[in-house]
UniProtKB/Swiss-Prot annotation:
Protein name listed in UniProt: DELTA-stichotoxin-Hmg2b
Source species: Heteractis magnifica
Other information: A synonymy between H.magnifica and R.crispa is controversial.
Subunit and partners: Octamer or nonamer in membranes. Monomer in the soluble state.
Site (Important in the initial contact with the lipid membrane): 113
Family matches, as Pfam families: Anemone_cytotox
Top-level taxon in the UniProt lineage: Eukaryota
Biological role: Pore-forming protein that forms cations-selective hydrophilic pores of around 1 nm and causes cytolysis. Pore formation is a multi-step process that involves specific recognition of membrane sphingomyelin (but neither cholesterol nor phosphatidylcholine) using aromatic rich region and adjacent phosphocholine (POC) binding site, firm binding to the membrane (mainly driven by hydrophobic interactions) accompanied by the transfer of the N-terminal region to the lipid-water interface and finally pore formation after oligomerization of monomers This toxin shows hemolytic activity.
């Protein structure tokens, strides 16, 4: 079967079964994440970049995500016996002239840390970097608690999402009007 991470699928088909397949593609890694973002914003988004605070990505962010399509992405800890997690932010420039930022954290040590995630819309065009990561991580992020969360993102957009609590995490997000 073809690799899923780094691809675009129909937004309506995004779900846990697809994200489980993305996790499986990452192999036997103790800290990893499969991410799906469904674009139901009414406009398109174009990938800017991914910034990894810890860990890495094996695939490139899908470049162009039309309305009613979902992007699939993944991250994992660095290979080898290293005490790192998969912690990052990535950014998409939206056709409305603003930037969609997504942050996720799958830590190495669950004695001190938990899974966290957040989504934010930034005015204008902004690449993901340490500042964007910190803005969302230290802002008011959602815990990866196996529960659905939603909020108003501003600019006429809403977000609904869920992240699992495991070291092999799934993050599913829907951006809508």
């Amino acid at each position: 079967s073809a690799a899923l991470a780094g691809t675009i699928i129909a937004g309506a088909s995004l779900g846990f079964q697809i994200l489980d397949k993305v996790l499986g593609e990452l192999g036997k890694v103790s800290r990893k994440i499969a991410i799906g973002v469904d674009n139901e914003s009414g406009g398109s988004t174009t990938a800017l970049n991914a910034y990894f605070r810890s860990g890495t990505g094996d695939v490139i962010l899908p470049e162009f995500v039309p309305n009613q399509k979902a992007l699939l992405y993944s991250g994992r800890k660095d290979t080898g016996p290293v005490a790192t997690g998969a912690v990052a932010a990535f950014a998409y420039y939206m056709s409305n002239g603003h930037t969609l930022g997504v942050m996720f954290s799958v830590p190495f040590d669950y004695n001190f840390y938990s899974n966290w995630w957040d989504v934010k819309v930034y005015s204008g065009k902004r690449r993901a970097d340490q500042g964007m990561y910190e803005d969302m991580y230290y802002g008011n992020p959602y815990r990866g608690d196996n529960g659905w969360h939603q909020k108003n993102l501003g600019y006429g957009l809403r977000m609904k999402g869920i992240m699992t609590s495991a070291g092999e995490a799934i993050l599913q997000i829907k951006i809508s009007r």
